[in-house]
């Protein structure tokens, strides 16, 4: 089920207006297929698998949480995600969704923890890496953000949001070459992306 990603920086002034705007566009313009955010069948889990009924109940709670999140009922959604994770700690969908809610409340370390858990369960997916990178940017952990984004573009090279956010990370690291390359790739995928276009110009990118 695809749901809009919540706004991650309702008051994140420490990123500065330019960075906040870029990251907001990077995430708010996309929808994530959370229903497919589940571990591969052959992945071993460090925790004992819960009983079948617990897994089903956890998935039902996660689905309710998504519906509540779409309706703007953040507290109720968080309660459902907490319940889902208590029933099934390996529910990557609930972990990722809860991470987005924490991110929307600027609780970025909690978001990082949830995205890390979701990534451990679904290492083939780019979404938890992108989410964690955004929170790392808010925490001024720019190198960690760049590392996540490097991995994310390998997992989903057609995702313009990831390339735009990677451009921000490398721009903040002072690597204009990688920033320009990232912004340029975002523009190739989404030519009307004004954030990527202005970032590309800002770092002195040359049209190829």
Segments predicted by a language model, with ranges:
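Bacterial signal peptide processing site
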Residues: 31-34
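Alpha-helical segment of the N-proximal tetratricopeptide repeat
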Residues: 53-90, 100, 104-107
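Helix-start (N-cap) detector for alpha-helical repeat units in TPR-like alpha-solenoids
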Residues: 58-59, 92-93, 126-127, 160-161, ...
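Position-specific recognition of the canonical hydrophobic site in helix A of tetratricopeptide repeat
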Residues: 62, 69, 96, 102-103, ...
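Structural signature of tandem alpha-helical TPR/SEL1-like repeats
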Residues: 71-83, 104-117, 139-151, 173-185
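TPR/TPR-like (Sel1-like) alpha-helical repeat modules
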Residues: 171-194, 201, 205
């Amino acid at each position: 089920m695809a749901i809009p990603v919540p706004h991650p920086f309702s008051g994140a002034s420490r990123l500065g207006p330019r960075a906040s705007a870029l990251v907001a566009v990077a995430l708010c313009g996309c929808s994530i297929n959370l229903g497919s955010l589940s571990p591969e069948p052959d992945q071993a889990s460090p925790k004992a698998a819960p009983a079948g009924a617990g897994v089903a109940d956890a998935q039902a709670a996660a689905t309710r949480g998504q519906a509540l999140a779409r309706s703007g009922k953040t507290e109720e959604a968080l309660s459902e995600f907490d319940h889902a994770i208590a029933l099934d700690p390996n529910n990557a969908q609930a972990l990722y969704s809860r991470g987005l809610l924490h991110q929307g409340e600027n609780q970025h370390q909690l978001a990082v923890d949830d995205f890390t858990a979701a990534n451990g369960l679904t290492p083939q997916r780019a979404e938890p890496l992108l989410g964690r990178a955004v929170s790392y940017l808010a925490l001024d952990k720019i190198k960690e953000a760049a590392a996540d984004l490097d991995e994310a573009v390998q997992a989903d090279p057609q995702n313009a949001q990831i390339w735009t956010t990677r451009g921000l990370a490398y721009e903040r690291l002072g690597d204009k070459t990688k920033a320009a390359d990232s912004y340029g790739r975002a523009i190739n995928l989404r030519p009307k992306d004004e954030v990527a276009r202005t970032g590309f110009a800002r770092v002195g990118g040359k049209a190829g």
